[in-house]
Amino acid sequence: MNKTSVPSIDSIERQWFLVDAENQTLGRLATEVASVLRGKNKPSFTPHLDTGDFVVVVNADKIRVSGNKANQKLYRRHSGRPGGMKVETFQALQDRLPERIVEKAIKGMLPHNALGRQLFRKLKVYRGPEHPHSAQRPQTLQLNPAASSQ
């Protein structure tokens, strides 16, 4: 009988991937990036370990959503003070902080525990095409072609 092998922390090879978010649909991009952050694309995937890779997302300001979500989708945050609820539409947040839209979408697809917080630290999102991670020589991650159609 074969036994399930659990990879040791030292044996996990981490790669860097570059994702161009230009003209990508937000949810479709987020699911694929979350899967790579978790390491689900590797044969050594273990649910309780961080086996994933680093992901750099560029052109976050050019992400798109389908339908009328640009005007209807709302992002809420609360300061913790009475009356401290702030509500902002997708379009307003994209003009102000486009990185936050991508980060929030991907973070919601990661585990909601300490492992998810550790995985989220491996995500780097930038507004434009420039990023400071060229020393890591990130490979371009090809997303599903259906994600960029329409």
Curated annotation (Swiss-Prot):
Lineage: Bacteria, Bacillati, Cyanobacteriota, Cyanophyceae, Synechococcales
Region (Disordered): 129-150
Primary role: This protein is one of the early assembly proteins of the 50S ribosomal subunit, although it is not seen to bind rRNA by itself. It is important during the early stages of 50S assembly.
Short name of any one Pfam family annotated for the protein: Ribosomal_L13
Name recorded for this polypeptide: Large ribosomal subunit protein uL13
Keyword Ribosomal protein: yes
CDD domains noted in UniProt: Ribosomal_L13 (cd00392)
GO molecular function list: mRNA binding; structural constituent of ribosome
Alphabetized UniProt keyword annotations: Ribonucleoprotein, Ribosomal protein
Top-level lineage group: Bacteria
Ribosomal protein keyword on record: yes
One GO cellular component term: cytosolic large ribosomal subunit
Subunit description: Part of the 50S ribosomal subunit.
Record field: compositional bias (Polar residues): 136-150
UniProt family annotation: Belongs to the universal ribosomal protein uL13 family.
GO BP annotations, alphabetical order: negative regulation of translation; translation
